[in-house]
Amino acid sequence: MRLARFIIVGAAALVLMGCNRLTSEGLPEGVLYQDDLDADTGNWILESDMDANARFAEGQLQLEITSPNLIAWAELREREFGDFVLEVDATQLGGPDDNSYGIIFRVKNPSAYYSFDISGDGYYAVRRRDEADGGSWTRITEDWLQSSAIHQGASINKIKIVAQGSHFAFYVNNEQIAEADDDTYRSGAIGLNAGSFHEPGVKVGFDNLIITKPE
């Protein structure tokens, strides 16, 4: 069960890694951005402090949460996406199964974005964070529903979002598990996130990110 509330890692914790500007030059037709996440290209803003660490290691972008009730993320630098299809492989590397990891998208600032998260014990949630209400959470789908599509424990899960206008579809391991409509945010940045609840020690690795145009 999801009982705890997250504390968000603040903007003061941001560590800017490199200054390379993103470009779509050389990408296949229809591909907006692609990154195997094997090494730091300078395209990501990484959060790092005593409570959370984001780094490139072992051929992945890894997020480690060392405090309870906290979420942290790595954000793609200098790019906004409105309509897109995003796919990424996420692997639980350590810590309790009562965790959270996934994608934040259409990010306006640290207090305004959508999130699609799954957990190591087989749940998922789609939520919106609202700056106007002090960073409160709004459920886009029913909060933390169980799905047999999610591989539990120390496993790899392929996470996918299709965003077209105000309509979203959410997939895990090639199975659609939810869809929703919301028009609060029309475009914004994207990020990869991980979070803890009562127990710290959550560690997640991300691989093989690709963002394409919807068909």
PLM features: what roles do these ranges have?
Residues 16-18:
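C-terminal motif of bacterial Sec signal peptides marking the signal peptidase cleavage site
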Residues 22-48:
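Extracellular carbohydrate-recognition regions
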Residues 37, 88, 152-180:
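Carbohydrate-binding surfaces in secreted/extracellular proteins
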Residues 134-158:
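Short, aromatic/His-centered strand-loop micro-motif at the edge of beta-sheets
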Residues 37, 207-211:
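Extracellular beta-strand elements of beta-rich domains used
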Residues 180-205:
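Flexible glycan-contacting loops in extracellular carbohydrate-active proteins
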Residues 52-72, 193:
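Short carbohydrate-recognition loop motifs
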